[in-house]
């Protein structure tokens, strides 16, 4: 036996749009406590773009930018939800031309070294990256099955990442996938890493 819904018991039951308790105790301004129905003027109950049961004004920021390549979320005025995250186009210069936007981030080697080895780390000298032409150990561009594919001379900065840890550690690297240069990283002027190749930014995006 299924009990009929009881308006005012603070349980959302079949046939009710809301249930905020008795009229004396109800703290939900969107809900008519006497009928357990939403007021006729209600547009929304909750959400980043809902305030006092109404959609907030179009253009109101509902999500802050997370990076120079990320776009702030703005309410549409027609929905309670913040729209899906949007980014600046891939390939747009960022961080004062040290990088290019890639999927909402600005990947640069200096930041990757910082994340791997801490505040004293920066990008190693170009000569270190020549190791990636060897195709042995940790130094390669790609793997095919168990075979290591060495980097072509023009692609060495899209293989293993090399960092310098001040004051005196040169050509430091990290093993595994974490130690590879991130996709979308600037490898030369107007070029980015894509599929472990250093390619023209305007061509790939």
UniProtKB/Swiss-Prot annotation:
Disulfide bonds join 7-26, 18-36, 62-82, 69-94, 101-106, 113-128, 151-158, 163-171, 193-198. Inhibits platelet aggregation induced by thrombin and arachidonic acid with IC(50) of 40 and 50 nM respectively (in rabbit platetelet-rich plasma). It also inhibits the adhesion of melanoma tumor cells on fibrinogen and fibronectin, by interfering with the function of alpha-V/beta-3 (ITGAV/ITGB3) and, to a lesser extent, with alpha-V/beta-6 (ITGAV/ITGB6) and alpha-5/beta-1 (ITGA5/ITGB1) integrins. A motif (D/ECD-tripeptide) lies at residues 68-70. Gene3D superfamilies: 3.40.1620.60, Disintegrin domain. Signal peptide: none annotated. GO terms for cellular component: extracellular region. Residues 4-90 form the Disintegrin domain. Monomer. Belongs to the venom metalloproteinase (M12B) family. P-III subfamily. P-IIIb sub-subfamily. Its main location: secreted. One of its GO terms (molecular function) is toxin activity. It comes from the Eukaryota. It is found in: Secreted. It comes from Macrovipera lebetina transmediterranea. Expressed by the venom gland. Glycans are attached at residue 120. Negative results: does not interact with the alpha-2/beta-1 (ITGA2/ITGB1) integrin. Does not inhibit platelet aggregation induced by collagen or ADP. The disintegrin domain belongs to the long disintegrin subfamily. SUPFAM superfamilies: Blood coagulation inhibitor (disintegrin). Coiled coil: none annotated. This is Disintegrin-like leberagin-C. The lineage of its organism: Eukaryota, Metazoa, Chordata, Craniata, Vertebrata. Keywords: Cell adhesion impairing toxin, Disulfide bond, Glycoprotein, Hemostasis impairing toxin, Platelet aggregation inhibiting toxin, Secreted, Toxin. It holds the Pfam family Disintegrin.
